[in-house]
Curated annotation (Swiss-Prot):
The record marks 99 as: Important for activity. SUPFAM superfamilies: Glutamyl tRNA-reductase catalytic, N-terminal domain, Glutamyl tRNA-reductase dimerization domain, NAD(P)-binding Rossmann-fold domains. It comes from Chlorobium phaeobacteroides (strain BS1). Gene3D superfamilies: Glutamyl-tRNA reductase, N-terminal domain, NAD(P)-binding Rossmann-like Domain. Its EC number is 1.2.1.70. The active site is at 50 (nucleophile). This is Glutamyl-tRNA reductase. It catalyses: (S)-4-amino-5-oxopentanoate + tRNA(Glu) + NADP(+) = L-glutamyl-tRNA(Glu) + NADPH + H(+). The keyword NADP applies.
Length: 426
């Protein structure tokens, strides 16, 4: 029994190729159904995100390998001539398990430690379950991957520290003010960056968030989504600067949207109560001279980038710990697979000796009393258990290579004259 993984990701293919092979949920369900119905796969799962489309397959036919699955996916997406085999990676057996463990643990992500991928893998497994393409092997593989990801998250710092500008800004504000729930926050700009910053603030329990934007309806839409319903007209928001403890700017502007005189006047009204200004604009939205004002803490993208770099370096230092967790779980998963592979032989071995026992006891059925026969049954059961203990233990023992398993199986089948000696390899 083997499991292969094949696909494209940010390491193997450019974005246009990844986009070309991306599968929607509807397509993924159809693709998996085709694999199972056509007998190509016994089990199958597809993980498809913006950065990867990866297939995890238990082959249903001898000719199904990585190259077969590459061509099948290319054909399904009608991408012949656009996508080449060298755009794909290919894994099999335990390397497939290792790859999924690394993906689920976010160490194979475009951004190291990016935790969103685990939810995407869980969604891929859900789809496989719904179309009944997840059997015993994929189910065990996925649940082990989920367990690995949980251990990595709780026992390492691989997912800690902001690695995006908007999140770094929020973390910095929390470090300075500690409790964001009691602070009043102004967001200038409701575009993608501003929206992310506002949502990160909300996740940190900030609730008093006021939004302003050149297009008022966009500010209102974001405020409604957050549940704050607090907006200011763009033309008049500067009249209220003194009311805010944190100001986040994220607008597209060639000129500064906040100048030193404006903030100096605001600070006088605040009686010099501290203010954090987080300038997420590019070009900068805030006059850098503002940073010289007393109790005014100004951080721009460069300052936040420094925080991000430190966090990424910290995450890289956690990689050996993650690798150790993955290695330990991989050993357990490999041993479980080996047990699956030898199970038919163990069943045959037990069945053969049980049959011998029944035949021999049958000879005494009418020669001894029922009580004596039961004692003989208990005695023979104990003898069989001791006889079979060593060969079964040997079959289940850990192996260094996959080739060891067939040789063990064949040895046992030959010694005990079991039928279908090549059952495992078939």
């Amino acid at each position: 029994m083997n499991i292969i993984s094949v696909g494209v990701n940010h390491k193997t293919a450019p974005i246009e190729i990844r986009e070309r092979l991306s599968l929607s949920e509807v397509q993924a369900k159809e693709f998996l159904t085709n694999l199972i119905d056509d007998g190509i796969a016994q089990e199958a799962m597809v993980v498809s995100t913006c950065n990867r489309t990866e297939l995890y397959v238990v082959p249903g036919m001898p000719e199904v390998d990585g190259n077969y699955m590459k061509e099948f996916l290319i054909s399904y997406k009608d991408a012949q001539g656009e996508v080449r085999p060298e755009h794909f990676f290919n894994r099999f057996y335990c390397n497939t398990a290792r790859h999924l463990f690394e993906v689920s643990s976010a160490v194979d992500s475009l951004i190291l430690g990016e935790g969103q991928i685990l939810g995407q893998v869980k969604n891929a497994y859900r789809i496989a379950v719904e179309v009944q393409s997840a059997g015993i092997l994929l189910t065990r593989l996925c649940h082990t991957a989920f367990s690995v990801a949980k251990k990595v998250k709780t026992k390492t710092k691989i997912m800690e520290g902001a690695v995006s500008v908007s999140y770094a800004a929020v973390e910095l504000a929390q470090k300075i003010f500690s409790n964001l729930s009691i602070k009043k926050i102004l967001l200038v700009g409701a575009g993608e960056t501003g929206e992310l910053a506002a949502k990160h603030m909300f996740q940190k329990n900030a609730r008093n968030i006021v939004i302003t934007n050149r297009t008022l309806s966009k500010a209102e839409a974001l405020a409604e989504e957050l549940g704050t319903n607090q907006v200011l007209p763009y033309e008049s928001y500067k009249d209220h600067l003194h009311e805010f403890d944190i100001i986040i700017t994220a607008v597209s502007s060639k000129e500064y949207v906040l100048t030193e005189p404006e903030l100096q006047q605001s600070m006088q009204k605040r009686r010099l109560k501290p203010v954090i200004i987080l300038d997420l604009g590019l070009p900068r939205n805030v006059d850098p001279e503002i940073g010289n004002l007393k109790n005014m803490f100004l951080k721009d993208i460069d300052a936040l980038k420094h925080i991000i770099d430190k966090n990424l370096e910290m995450r890289k230092c956690e990689l050996p710990k993650v690798k150790k967790i993955i290695d330990e779980e991989l050993v357990g998963f490999a041993q479980w697979i080996n047990t699956l592979k030898v199970r038919p032989t163990i069943v045959d071995l037990q069945s053969k000796f049980l049959e011998i026992k029944e035949k021999e006891l049958e000879r005494f059925r009418y020669k001894v009393s029922d009580a004596e026969l039961k004692r003989m049954e208990r005695l023979t059961d104990r003898i069989l258990k001791k006889i079979l203990h060593h060969p079964i233990k040997m079959l289940k023992a850990p192996v260094d290579t996959a080739d060891t398993i067939p040789s063990r199986v064949n040895l046992v089948r030959n010694i005990f004259d079991l039928e279908e000696q090549n059952r495992l390899s078939k």
